[in-house]
Amino acid sequence: MSEQDATALVLFSGGQDSTTCLAWALDRFARVETIGFSYGQRHGIELDCRARLRDGIAQLRADWADKLGCEHTLDIPTLAAISETALTRDVAIEMGADGLPNTFVPGRNLVFLTFAAALAYRRGIRHIVGGMCETDYSGYPDCRDETIKALQVALSLGMARPFELHTPLMWLTKAATWQLAHDLGGRGLVDLIRDESHTCYLGERGARHDWGHGCGRCPACELRAHGWRAYVGGGA
């Protein structure tokens, strides 16, 4: 297997989904690098969690520690400058007239994947892994399978490189995502994700629940909590 085919770049935010995807990639590729983005988001809690999660995941399995490669963080503040959303402004979370919550940052995943592909191109990496999902999600159009497939074609044509965008969570519920984490890394990985990853839109780390830290009221917390309860209840 060539180095291009043996290496993956994971979009790693510090949340539940991206941490599960990191474990998924470590289970399948010989070397895995991670990339995160500082885009002027409302809080930087997830970014702060990333180092602890990388350290923790490396301690779970020696082979994962050996495979875990470079970490990259890109600054793209322009995304926040052109986005009036609840993830980039201190405003209440609510539904918009278009049926999308105002947590939707237009083009965010498209921008992330494009920057990831540009970095992957420079580093000779063909495989890019993201935690997009259209099963338990808020209707974000840039999380849809058809969007990711179309972008894979565009990036491959635009850079003359046969990129493959992997979305292992695309058809999984949040309960099934918890189960996948258990299948990959046992209780140790589940506990690491529960205790150290961050999902809450409001950046709340003070409150501790059985499913992890968060306000417990925002859509992201509610989705994570519902998935946890279904997982522990055997409904994954």
Swiss-Prot record:
Keyword Cytoplasm recorded: no
Binding site for Zn(2+): 200, 215, 218, 221
Cofactor requirement: Zn(2+)
InterPro entries xref list: QueC, Rossmann-like_a/b/a_fold
Pathway of action: Purine metabolism; 7-cyano-7-deazaguanine biosynthesis
Disulfide bond sites: none
GO biological process terms, semicolon-separated: queuosine biosynthetic process
EC code: 6.3.4.20
Keyword Glycoprotein: no
Residues reported to bind ATP: 12-22
Pfam families xrefs: QueC
GO molecular function: ATP binding; ligase activity, forming carbon-nitrogen bonds; zinc ion binding
Reactions catalysed: 7-carboxy-7-deazaguanine + NH4(+) + ATP = 7-cyano-7-deazaguanine + ADP + phosphate + H2O + H(+)
Comment on bound cofactor: Binds 1 zinc ion per subunit.
Keywords: ATP-binding, Ligase, Metal-binding, Nucleotide-binding, Queuosine biosynthesis, Zinc
Functional description taken from the UniProt entry: Catalyzes the ATP-dependent conversion of 7-carboxy-7-deazaguanine (CDG) to 7-cyano-7-deazaguanine (preQ(0)).
Family from the record: Belongs to the QueC family.
Protein name: 7-cyano-7-deazaguanine synthase
